Amino acid sequence: MHKDDILKELKKVLPEEIIKVDEPLKRYTYTQTGGNADFYLSPTTNEQVQAINHLARMNNIPVTYLGNGSNIIIREGGIRGIVLSLLSMDYIKVEDNVIIAGSGAAIIDVSRKARDYSLTGLEFACGIPGSIGGAVFMNAGAYGGEVRDCIEHAVCVNERGEIVTLTRDELELGYRSSIVQKQHLVVLEASFNLAPGNQEEIQSVMDDLTNRRETKQPLEYPSCGSVFQRPPGHFAGKLIQDSELQGHRIGGVEVSKKHAGFMVNVDNGTATDYEDLIHHVQNVVKEKFDVELHPEVRIIGDHPEEHQ
């Protein structure tokens, strides 16, 4: 379908105010890089998500789901078809010891809400800069905790546009992986089963984790968070540090001098700079230690030369 025809079809099923055409995606990524989306849609209801999925499936339009852009690199060529953002679905509800959060809610905010209600179990998430949808997608974790530890179930949309509810076991949450990734599901909502706790003790744990994060991580620059998964028996940051790569720079992106597991945008870096630096680090670590580093960050979109 031509873009004008797609736009006409979108306007039949969605309010115009949630449709953006040729939208710069660097506005929505922590790295501040990325080309344009043909269509950037920000639905506010499950029904709108289903309508978008149905329209896309019937017309063979690719759909890319975007969380809050914290652990993703989008290439300068942008993304064809539809980019679907669920950030407007950011509600947080508390029912007894269960917190229910929309896909677009920041997991930091959900962690704070748990604290406010003296519920323990989400302290580990107090510094994770991601949305609930993204956190479930990759089983986000930090400081010894992860989503798998406390999630009860997630409500998702499958590729056929059907709404399904998956239990913790059915989500198959592993190290930075889930069935959501494997089956191309879209998380609409997640419920977390927490335990009653002492609010002061919960706050104390969160303060400690926040201090550790601020002390060790390069929060003063744009970045995509931890770049590589932890290889078995090793720490990615230690391997990179021992390869003397801290401070190594390609274009405007460098391996952080503060934490070797991060790459920071210090001077108008591009997605290409990030990708080239990632490949360079992988090659050096492989050569020095014979260890394969696999990206934790998602790299998506067209290369610039594909969209000229």
From Swiss-Prot:
EC number(s) from the headed UniProt entry: 1.3.1.98
FAD-binding PCMH-type domain span: 33-197
SUPFAM superfamilies: FAD-binding/transporter-associated domain-like, Uridine diphospho-N-Acetylenolpyruvylglucosamine reductase, MurB, C-terminal domain
Catalytic activity: UDP-N-acetyl-alpha-D-muramate + NADP(+) = UDP-N-acetyl-3-O-(1-carboxyvinyl)-alpha-D-glucosamine + NADPH + H(+)
GO MF terms, alphabetically ordered: FAD binding; UDP-N-acetylmuramate dehydrogenase activity
Active site: R176, S226 (proton donor), E296
GO cellular component: cytosol
Metabolic or biological pathway, per its Swiss-Prot or TrEMBL entry: Cell wall biogenesis; peptidoglycan biosynthesis
InterPro entries per UniProt: FAD-bd_PCMH (IPR016166), FAD-bd_PCMH-like_sf (IPR036318), FAD-bd_PCMH_sub1 (IPR016167), FAD-bd_PCMH_sub2 (IPR016169), MurB (IPR003170), MurB_C (IPR011601), MurB_C_sf (IPR036635), Oxid_FAD_bind_N (IPR006094)
GO BP, sorted A to Z: cell division; cell wall organization; peptidoglycan biosynthetic process; regulation of cell shape
Purpose of the protein: Cell wall formation.
Family: Belongs to the MurB family.
HAMAP family named among the record's database cross-references: MurB
Protein name listed in UniProt: UDP-N-acetylenolpyruvoylglucosamine reductase
Organism from which the protein derives: Staphylococcus carnosus (strain TM300)
